[in-house]
Amino acid sequence: MSDSRPNISRHDDGTPSKDIANVGKSSLNPFKVLRYGDYKFVWPTEALSLWAMEMEIIVLAIFVLRDTNSPLLVGLIGAVKFAGTLFGPLYGLMVDRFNRKLLQVGVRVFGVALAITLTTLIITDKLELWHAYAIVTAGSMVRMLDLILIQTLTADAVPSHALHGAIGLSRSTLDGARVVGSIVGGTLLELLGLDWAYITITVLYLMATITAIKIDSRPVKTDSETVSIWRGFKEGLHYIKENPLLPGLIFFSFLIEFTAFPLVNGLMAVIGSDLYNQNGTGIGLLAAIASAGALSGAALLGIKQSVLNPGRIMILGSFTWHALMLLLALTPPLWLFTVLLLLWGFSGGITFVAMVVALLRTAPAKTRGRVMGIRSLGIYGLSLGLLFGGWISQEAGPATMIGVLGGIGLSATLIAVIKWPALFRSE
């Protein structure tokens, strides 16, 4: 590594980064961040896993809806995917205390084993509804560990000044996976059946595992190993409490999971089927349109040379995101609904990337795993939002569900701005 002097060119731990001479140059290439360390392996293992997960979400949502005709149970299959969120703080401590590469490989192997189990049940025609719920719940036990690992591995490999590019690429990958996964998953299910859809999902999980093996080993420092679990958890809570930005950022992580993400994490099957009479392919296309918008928003923020005031971007994006939900709730003609859905996804992509950039910039390297682990509890908002949204859809219809969640999001964003004004001024 070169010994460069500008502060912006250094990692959070003070070590200088590479390619400093290029910092001042602009580039529209979102993949330029792959030159940093082993991020060229961190990103592919995330991408392959996300493609598998997004196919799985749409395939299982359609399967449950057809088997039960219950929007509430569709919401439940999405919600149980995040049951393991409760262990987020513990996983954060694990990430700070153990070799992150070995943890990542272990997560991938476990995911492959579950996918093979479900595929076997499908092929042998022994799959029952409770099997799907049980296997998805088991997978949720490591899903949160996977998320924390990816975020910390990214922050380990990519210097602070380029972090927004990595987060933008990561978010674009998620939304790209939703575009491809929704279309491919829905189409495979319609044309070839549940068995071939899950065989494809299993192959993607296997490829993600192989890529994870290429990540550099990250032995932990001695001082991290000697910190007790309880002490480490208290340190994370104390740091969050004393920081003027983190409480508000963690609140927003819960809010958007509760109000916005349920629409593209299972409930799109209900929206497409009940409001616009779409089949599996049509539902997949609607989810893909929302994700294409989010991909564009995340990519736009990711290719910027620098991102100032990510908190302000997050707040303005949240207002726009939830206001568009009120327009979607009016159930306009399908062509206009898709246009609004694209804009909704675009504002969501910008909002999410800004939030994660602010979180990772604010959390120091030595406590990053603990802070992100505690932050992960906010993802319980998605489980609650899926159940709440599924219940509203069942009782009052999908349009009412979209409007209620959008109204809650707008109100909560306004309250957050009043409660944590530092978010709007953060650099």
Where are these predicted regions, by residue range?
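Core transmembrane helices of Major Facilitator Superfamily
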Residues: A138-I150, W344-M355
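C-terminal transmembrane bundle of multi-pass solute transporters/carriers
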Residues: G75-I77, L90, R97, K101-A113, ...
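Helix-loop boundary and gating motifs at the non-cytosolic
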Residues: G24-A83, H238, E242-A290
